[in-house]
């Protein structure tokens, strides 16, 4: 009779496939929240005659409602194709490389719980490596998401994700695809460390509590916690990254940081915090839950008699 025997580990390619699939599924589910976050981050203070500010987008729910009203429901999924491009590459690499890099840091003979600082270092490295490769997809996603409702007769900059890649290269040069790479490396390395290392550590801690095991509940709790840490730590860098990618008037990362701080104050770096947390918390819960379940499929050995 045919049967299955559990495997101890899966290959890098299998991990890459699992990670890319889980990241794409989470992206598809949560990109409206990401679109709201980008719009809030790119929004600047608008002076009026009486000295007050009347922002177009107010809060996560208000932003979602405004986009849906002005641009239709499909407007909430702007940049989804580029987002899926990004997750296939970035999601697959950052998670797929995490375990091999951890093993490289501690040695293949290591037995026991890997120290937290080693997990953080591994996640920092894989996040940086992955986004260097995936930066063009991130740039295109932000450019597409940043376009709101345009006045009558004003054409859109890009017809879609593929057109955006070609248009950017044609008008701005190949190097433009890596615009904002500096803050993007910083942001994604830090957020990746906050997500992967915290998920790893929290899951490990939860499973030491009586009656808790490697279950759906454990994955959900650890995923939500990972999203919270990621937003708290990465939000300022995320704002700078979004502004540099969505607005070419900034000379560099420092210029963007100084101008934002000078004109809008420190709280500008936490614009879109609620939709960002709602999105990342949900994203991480969905992604890690999906990842754990898909990996279980690969962790079953090939059918044998």
From Swiss-Prot:
Induction info: By chloramphenicol.
GO MF: amino acid transmembrane transporter activity
SUPFAM superfamilies the record matches: Mitochondrial carrier
Membrane-crossing segments per the record: 16-36, 73-93, 120-140, 179-199, 220-240, 270-290
Membrane topology summary: Multi-pass membrane protein
Chain positions of Solcar repeats: 10-104, 114-205, 214-297
Family the UniProt entry places it in: Belongs to the mitochondrial carrier (TC 2.A.29) family.
Annotated function: PUMPS are mitochondrial transporter proteins that create proton leaks across the inner mitochondrial membrane, thus uncoupling oxidative phosphorylation. This leads to a decrease in the efficiency of oxidative phosphorylation and an increase in heat production. May be involved in protecting plant cells against oxidative stress damage.
Name this polypeptide is given: Mitochondrial uncoupling protein 2
Species annotation: Arabidopsis thaliana (Mouse-ear cress)
Underlying gene: PUMP2
